[in-house]
Every structure is written in structure tokens, then in C-alpha cells.
Amino acid sequence: MSFLSSAKKVRAITGKGVLSQLGDIVGLRLGPGKLGAAEYYDYRLFDESRMNDERRREFVGWRGEEILEDTLIDEYSKIVSIDKLTFYSLARGLGFRIPRIYSIYHPAGRAFADVPTLRDAESIVRFLRNGIEYPFFGKPSYGGYGQGVVSVDSIDRAADRLKLSNGDELEVMQFATGLPNRAGMGYIFQERLAVHPEIRVRSGAGVAGCRLMVLMRASGPQLFRAVWKITSGDNITDNFSHGKSGNMLGSIDPDSGVVTSVVRGMGLDQSELTHHPETGKTLAGFEIPYWQEAVSVCLRAAGAFPGFLVQGWDVVISESGPVLLEMNMIGCADLHQIADHRGIRDQVFREFVQEMGVERNLAGASWPWMRNAKTGRYGRRQAHWPY
């Protein structure tokens, strides 16, 4: 939708004039969050019942989030977030619970612990016929947003076909020859996690996990924000995908683990829900099981990754407790901003960046002379660790 179309629709709904909206947009684009026009509407910053100028300026756009990453994430640490096998290796070695890995596909023979490495289609086929446990979940080691993932229920040995969780079927050889090897980092075959029964009965068959944003403060890791990524329909992942997936977001009170509100979609198409549209179960007011255990494990794990001053942890709550899926850079500010109706640059976050000594990089325009002369980056970490 174009700016003018959006502006006219907002004027019709709220009475806020087009020029008034344009003034907001220009001010926010030049401000610390560097929001664009589309983000103004995506985050519903025109809504005067929730927003004033101060609250609008707490929101961060994708341009602002890039500067946050440049400032708060060590460049040399990023592989831990980008490559899932690297993360799994570290987390497993440190004793944290991760999904059970069945095998790795990697043409050059990349290894992981004591699981088999499959180097070609023939070895994949043999493993799928005789070696793997069903059901299983597959995903690229490099990638995100649910791209390249597959959820397999079982194998029809007589027909030599895999039965997928969405009802589709694939010939085993067809599946094996079509596996991606993105960035040469391989493909992971792992257990298909079963979420806690209290979550499953509400969210359906998909794996509905939680995203916890942690700040690495001088006094130690602090849980800052949390969101429940609620699955919908036949979706096998909980990715929100800017509202296009049909999945929902639940804002979680960090202290209690109670879901305080739930939204679906973005911007002018956003709706607020109290119950799941398919299961009919209550979402708002639901207390996430094992919440304190999930918070505890994320805070303990956070200290093992000092190159990430802001961390976004993906955690699945299983019947027996929390399981770590991955650790993200920042962790997608949009998820929290949409779910919470609140920008991440609130008072707590501003105190944090002041504590880290990087507030000038995030206060407004980021000029070239503010970059570290040695590394060419904004970041405290690159300046602090002169590799």
C-alpha cells in the first residue's frame, strides 16, 4: 500500500490528517530509530490512543536496528548466531539442552559430535530408510525465517516416500537430492520437538516457541522483553514473517511469564485477540509453563556469549522443560515492538546503552567520524577488542 493510500485510510479511521502523519514520519526518519514510512504504519504509530511523541521515538526501524547490531554485536562473534551448528556445538559443550541431532548433511564432511555426516544423496537415502528416528525436523545450518525447513512424520517403506506433517509426500531420493547447502554450512536432521501439552492445546500442532531478549548489563544478564510466537494453521514454524505467515505474537510479562496480550498481523490489518482463532483456547492470560526455568537457562547461557551485548534467545517449552533453539543478534526488534505496542528504546534500554558508553551512536544521526578509526565500525566491542 502506498503512503498516500495508507495516510488516507488512517485519516478516515482516526481523523489524523495526512500532513500531520507526514510530519510524524519525517521526524521519526531523522530520529534515533530511523523509521521509514512503512514502519510508521506497521507499528501503528499514528494511533493517538496509544502513542505520543515520546513513545513514538522509542521505536526502532530496520535502519536503526542495523546500527544497533553494528554497535552492540562483535563482528567476529556473529558466526555463533548465523550458523546453527556452531551454536549447537557450543551450547552442547556447555551442558545446555538443545534438540537431539540425528545427522548432518555436508558434502565436505563437516562433523558434529558423534553423529553421522552424510556427504551425498545416496548416503542421505540410506539414512532416511534405515537410520533416522521418525518423526524428524530438518533445517539448513545457515538461514532463518523458516526457509528450507521440513517436518517429516514418517516413511512409507513400501512406496519409498516420506510423509510430511502438512500432508504432502515426497520420494526419498527426490527429497535427498533437493536438500539445500546454504553458504556451504550444511543441513541438520534433528528431533522434532514436542511442545508442552498446555501450549499445544492452545497453539495447535506447530512448534510455538518464545523469544527472550537479554541485555548484557555491567551487573550481569537481564531479561528485557519476551514474546510468545503462536503458530496457526498448517505452519510448522512459529515465524511471524512481518505478519504474512498468519502466526500470532503474544506479549509476555517477563517477571511472571503471563501472556498479557496477543496480536495478529501488522499495521492497518492488525487485530487483537484473546483466543486462538482455530483451537478456540484462551491465549491472553495464559501462563507459559516452566517460565522461571526458561528465564534462568537463558540468563546462564547468555554469559557464554560476551560478543553479543543484546541477545535474542529462541526457546521451546517441552513437556520436560525449556530447550534452546538458537541465539540471535538483537533478536528482531519488530517482534517485541509489535507484540508490546512499545518501542525497544525505552528508559531501561537507554540506561543500558549509556552504561555501555555507546549512547552517542544511537542518539540521532550517526556520522562517519563517530566510527572507530581502527575498525571502521560504530561498535564498542570492536573498539574494546582490537583484534
Task: Provide a role label for each language-model segment.
Residues 2-133, 142-144, 298:
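Conserved N-proximal alpha/beta basic substrate-recognition cap immediately N-terminal to
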Residues 13, 152-164, 238-254, 361-380:
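A short, terminal or domain-edge coil/loop segment
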Residues 83, 139, 314, 326:
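Acidic active-site catalytic centers that drive phospho-/nucleotidyl reactions
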Residues 84-210, 387:
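Active-site nucleotide/adenylate-binding loops and adjacent lid/helix of ATP-dependent enzymes
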Residues 107-108, 142-144, 194-195, 219, ...:
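Short, solvent-exposed loop/turn segments at secondary-structure junctions
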Residues 136, 222, 323-325:
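Protein kinase-like catalytic core scaffold
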Residues 177-205, 214-217, 223-225, 229-318:
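A long amphipathic alpha-helix within ATP-dependent nucleotide-binding catalytic cores
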Residues 268-299, 303-308, 317-387:
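C-terminal active-site "lid" helix and adjoining low-complexity regulatory extension at the edge
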